[in-house]
């Protein structure tokens, strides 16, 4: 299979799990991360036909050059997954402006930039994009006002883009995870939080990855937000 899947934030967590599933299906992977060595290690684990790239998605020049390099070495990108993200938990009155901006730039602007860069070739050939959001973007949460704004904005952006490019055979969807075992949640006390989750546990990155791959490959779904949270939204 010659189709190419670019996974931004593909060196760890949900992004890495998506890359593993897509590699198993025979797609060629571009593993993109800020840390090139970690990205290379992930690409190496997947096998010889996959490549690693360094990119700071908050920088327009980085995104543009990364897409040029991916297309040069792998070919046009057919699937795009935006799984890169950061969080700076803090009550708004205590949140530094630079922390607000870093979350906005990575979680929202970065995804806008990668999606726009992908359009250059996808408009000619079609494609599928999945942006990894968060249940917090739908529910909100104390101490995560800035983070929630970025993830809520991601949903509005993705739905709008889905409308813009549907006639070009480009689909855009969102996966909104709840509490998932990743680096972002490892500091949380699971026993305290899981009592509010109907399924009684945190999810695994691979479980979210299956949802991402489902949306990537589903030809008649676009503009959808798929919640993967063990039923957490039912308790709101």
Curated annotation (Swiss-Prot):
Residues with N6-acetyllysine modification: 40, 96, 194
Protein's cellular compartments: Mitochondrion matrix
Main location: mitochondrion
Top-level taxon: Eukaryota
Site location (Important for interaction with acyl carrier protein (ACP)): 168
Binding-site residues, NADP(+): 11-14, 34-35, 83-85, 147, 151, 180-182
Any GO BP annotation: doxorubicin metabolic process
EC number: 1.1.1.100, 1.6.5.10
Signal peptide: none
GO MF annotation list: 3-oxoacyl-[acyl-carrier-protein] reductase (NADPH) activity; NAD(P)H dehydrogenase (quinone) activity; NADPH binding; NADPH dehydrogenase (quinone) activity; oxidoreductase activity, acting on the CH-OH group of donors, NAD or NADP as acceptor; quinone binding
SUPFAM superfamilies in alphabetical order: NAD(P)-binding Rossmann-fold domains
Binding-site residues, substrate: 134
Modified residues (N-acetylmethionine): 1
This protein's UniProt keywords: Acetylation, Fatty acid biosynthesis, Fatty acid metabolism, Lipid biosynthesis, Lipid metabolism, Mitochondrion, NAD, NADP, Oxidoreductase
Annotated Pfam families: adh_short_C2 (PF13561)
Catalysed reactions, semicolon-separated: a (3R)-hydroxyacyl-[ACP] + NADP(+) = a 3-oxoacyl-[ACP] + NADPH + H(+); a quinone + NADPH + H(+) = a quinol + NADP(+)
GO cellular component, one term: mitochondrial matrix
Pathway recorded for this protein: Lipid metabolism; fatty acid biosynthesis
Subunit record text: Homotetramer (in vitro). Heterotetramer with HSD17B8; contains two molecules each of HSD17B8 and CBR4. Does not form homotetramers when HSD17B8 is coexpressed, only heterotetramers (in vitro).
Function description: Component of the heterotetramer complex KAR (3-ketoacyl-[acyl carrier protein] reductase or 3-ketoacyl-[ACP] reductase) that forms part of the mitochondrial fatty acid synthase (mtFAS). Beta-subunit of the KAR heterotetramer complex, responsible for the 3-ketoacyl-ACP reductase activity of the mtFAS, reduces 3-oxoacyl-[ACP] to (3R)-hydroxyacyl-[ACP] in a NADPH-dependent manner with no chain length preference, thereby participating in mitochondrial fatty acid biosynthesis.
Protein name as annotated: 3-oxoacyl-[acyl-carrier-protein] reductase
């Amino acid at each position: 299979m010659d189709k190419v899947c670019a996974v931004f934030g593909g060196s760890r967590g949900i992004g890495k799990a998506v890359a593993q599933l897509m590699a198993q299906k025979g797609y060629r992977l571009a593993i993109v991360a800020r840390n090139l060595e970690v990205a290379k290690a992930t690409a190496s684990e997947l096998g010889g036909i996959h490549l690693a790239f360094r990119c700071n998605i908050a920088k327009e020049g980085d995104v543009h050059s990364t897409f040029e390099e991916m297309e040069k070495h792998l070919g046009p990108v057919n699937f795009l997954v935006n799984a890169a993200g950061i969080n700076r938990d803090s009550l708004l009155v205590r949140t530094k402006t630079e922390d607000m901006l870093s979350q906005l730039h990575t979680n929202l602007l970065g995804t806008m930039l990668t999606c726009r860069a992908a359009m250059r070739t996808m408009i000619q050939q079609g494609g599928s994009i999945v942006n990894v959001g968060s249940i917090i973007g739908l529910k909100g949460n104390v101490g995560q006002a800035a983070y929630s704004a970025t993830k809520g904005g991601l949903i509005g952006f993705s739905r709008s883009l889905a409308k813009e490019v549907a006639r070009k055979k480009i689909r855009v969807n969102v996966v909104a995870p709840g509490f998932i075992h990743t680096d972002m949640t490892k500091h949380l006390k699971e026993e305290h939080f899981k009592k509010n989750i109907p399924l009684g546990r945190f999810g695994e990155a691979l479980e979210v990855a299956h949802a991402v791959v489902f949306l990537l490959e589903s030809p008649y779904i676009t503009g959808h937000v798929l919640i993967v949270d063990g039923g957490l939204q039912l308790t709101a």
